[in-house]
């Protein structure tokens, strides 16, 4: 990555590099081809991340997050409609996703999160604060964890796919 030091120094987001990595299939490596991914295994992902990290640790982190969190979660748990809307463009690198778990007073302890999701008709209203969100400023969708049933403990935590242009 000939520009890595400059990007770090100037706090530049590697948008063009990510676009090119997406075109190469590196942003959806373990996603099946039918959903826009490369259909590879996790060893291939690890080796790719290692090579990218040799040139730029920040870019490798973004590639890791995109593959493992938004793509991985939607691939495993998403409906076909969610995969069509989100997984395909995420895997092709046309969109970026971010992962919203960490909170100011609970850290990354998922069982202690306080962000709530309250039902409002057919929708949910999310209330809470998240931080340390890799690619959050540049993402088009967020994977957000929130408590939907406080009495159920860990089983009362749900995961939401939220377009980042959603007001609030």
Regions found by a protein language model. Name each.
Residues 108-109, 124:
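Hydrophobic, small-residue-rich alpha-helical packing segments that form membrane-like cores
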Residues 23-94, 134-141:
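Internal helix-loop-helix
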Residues 112-114, 167-168:
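Flexible, small-/acidic-enriched active-site or ligand-binding loops
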């Amino acid at each position: 990555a000939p520009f890595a030091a400059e990007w770090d120094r100037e706090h530049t987001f590697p948008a063009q590099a990510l676009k090119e990595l997406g075109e190469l299939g590196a942003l959806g490596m373990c996603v099946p081809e039918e959903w826009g991914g490369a259909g590879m295994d996790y060893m291939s992902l690890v080796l790719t991340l290692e090579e990218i990290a040799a040139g730029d640790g920040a870019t490798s982190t973004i590639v890791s997050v995109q593959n493992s969190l938004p793509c991985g979660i939607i691939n495993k748990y998403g409906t076909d409609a969610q995969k069509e809307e989100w997984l395909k463009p995420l895997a092709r690198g046309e969109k970026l996703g971010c992962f919203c778990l960490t909170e100011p007073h609970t850290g990354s302890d998922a069982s202690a999160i306080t962000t709530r999701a309250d039902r409002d008709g057919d929708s949910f209203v999310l209330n809470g604060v998240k931080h340390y969100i890799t690619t959050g400023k540049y993402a088009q969708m967020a994977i957000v964890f929130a408590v939907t049933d406080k009495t159920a403990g860990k089983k009362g935590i749900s995961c939401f796919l939220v377009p980042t242009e959603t007001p609030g």
